[in-house]
Design a protein with these regions (language model features):
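N-terminal Rossmann-like or analogous alpha/beta NTP/dinucleotide-binding catalytic cores
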Residues: 2-135
């Protein structure tokens, strides 16, 4: 009997595709969010010729849940499908409840789902001075 070759599992990918690719190119005919963005970016749209730039802004005060996973797929997936970018921005506005271990866990979970923010990792607190200025 021939030994079956073991497949290397890539976290977050099923049959070589991310959840977003499956949603947008699988059995789903259309997705209203993607359709609306395409209208805005398309000829005559208010954002014609521009790139999609989304963000996923979790608060690092606990572990992610299934609702976060859905938001990750929508935020990172929409950017991926449309050739845009997605930032990971920690909403660190409540330092009493936040912890670095949650930041690490969030990053690991996003990678497990098959996405990466590259060099676009931010904290909301990075922009506090600007927020105070504009307030």
């Amino acid at each position: 009997m021939e030994k079956k070759k073991e497949e290397k599992r890539i976290p977050g990918r099923v049959n070589g595709v991310t959840p977003a690719e499956e949603i947008y190119t699988g059995n789903v005919i259309s997705h209203f969010i993607l359709d609306e963005i395409r209208k805005d970016l398309g000829p005559g749209g208010p954002m014609e010729g521009r790139k999609v730039h989304t963000r996923f802004p979790p608060e690092p005060n606990g572990f992610l849940h299934i609702g976060h996973a859905k938001a990750i797929v929508i935020d990172f997936g929409t950017a991926e499908i449309l050739g845009g970018l997605c930032n990971l921005r920690m909403d660190d506005t409540n330092p009493v409840k936040e912890d670095e271990r949650f930041v690490r866990a969030i990053k690991e979970d996003i990678h497990w789902l098959g996405y990466d923010w590259e060099d676009r990792f931010y904290h909301a607190s990075d922009f506090f001075e600007d927020m105070y200025f504009y307030a």
